[in-house]
């Protein structure tokens, strides 16, 4: 009797381990609500600033995330000034993770609107005394490790002010966490 009970317990434990081994190793392959938070730095001819983004959405297909987000960028945007701009992007994000493994490469696309809410606009050169708005696009590649992400990318922003508009390109390096 004790041997049969022991064998039943071993069988239950073995089936539990086998079924969990066949599950999703990558959170991107679990359908339903998903979100991520990421932080990183921008480089253009040296250090150009930092950013934080939060996005939420849905894993609509295994490996494919679609969502919306908002962020904060503190970036030297104007080449005519040493003052950093306080930029707020709102965006749509598409992200595809290639493998259902603990370690998986991915591609990431973001695009949307960006606004300049710099508190020091009065210190900007003439013609930049109003808050500007425009659009941005970011493409990146990286590696997921369980719920963490490490990536590099290219960030392009265009902001229009009352008298002029400015474009800016920067390299991004960041880390993220998926929830």
Where are these regions (language model features)?
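Gram-negative (and chloroplast) outer-membrane scaffold detector with strong preference
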Residues: 29-33, 38-46, 50-148, 177-179
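Cleavable N-terminal export/targeting peptides
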Residues: 1-29
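A short acidic/glycine-rich loop-to-helix N-cap element
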Residues: 159-166
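N-terminal leader regions
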Residues: 164, 175-178
